[in-house]
Amino acid sequence: DEELRAALDEMFRHSSVLLAQEFIPTEFDWRIGLLDGEPLFACKYYMAKGHWQIYNHAHDDTGRNLCGAWETVPIYKAPQKVLDTAVKAAALIGKGLYGVDLKLINGRAVVIEINDNPSIDHKVEDAVLGDELYYRILNHFVHCLNRLHAQ
């Protein structure tokens, strides 16, 4: 109790708000990429070996960060509960480009975070759609700009 209070006091020196989240260990997180409210890509991000996150920022002997594997799957192969929850979560923010990270626990999809600037890496998030992924994203932003310009 005393150790927790000391840690909280230290954290509150740097921020007026703290967010606590239940630790839910899983083999991987789902990342559902959404564009304009629709699922765009689905990836499994596996935890770094011997670590509780997908990235282990404690460097290995070469000075590189250690990261877990990934697996990109077609949207139709992602669990429907994960897709539905990702769509609902992102809708609370808007219809832009989002990456929603979730865990599936006993049939329950739990949102871990919503990224408004999701990473889209070559041969990772684009592994299923290829160049079509980038075409869809660029086309979306061109339409947004055209709507703004027309006003």
Roles of regions detected by a PLM:
Residues P25-T26, G37, I105-R108:
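Short strand-connecting beta-turns/loops that link adjacent beta-strands
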